């Protein structure tokens, strides 16, 4: 979805609005809180067409938005991931979709309200999302699924360890 915000976070030095390293987040959150499934699909298709035009044949999509505008899970937990897979297949690019696990707003901090569409309510909730995305991916050619965390700030250390154990089959 961030492809759609190109230019929205860039300010001329004489702009009245404060502009610093983190000010792009305001634009990103504003877009994330409005974008709908059909927008996600259209944005992804535009980006993937451009990537193909420049010679890329595979994209790894770090996918953050998992919840609807009311912060509920979609009926199809993989709804937005499926929109991305559909876009990739429609333009003919190979896809590895990586649903991102995000649970906190910083080291030991609660999430900000602007982050609500990115959040998994628990590690188990994230695993359910990832399983739904894996099931969805079987319907599309050249679609793989990975695991990912936002960062050490965005996921508690114990859940990072659980993720690693889960990926290696040691959970």
Question: What would you call each of these model-derived segments?
Answer:
Residues 1-6, 171:
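Histidine-centered catalytic micro-motifs
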Residues 2, 22-25, 102:
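Generic, ordered loop/turn and secondary-structure boundary motif
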Residues 7-94, 124-140:
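Alpha-helical scaffold segments that flank or form the walls of functional sites
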Residues 67-171:
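Metal-coordinating catalytic core of metallo-dependent amide/deamination hydrolases
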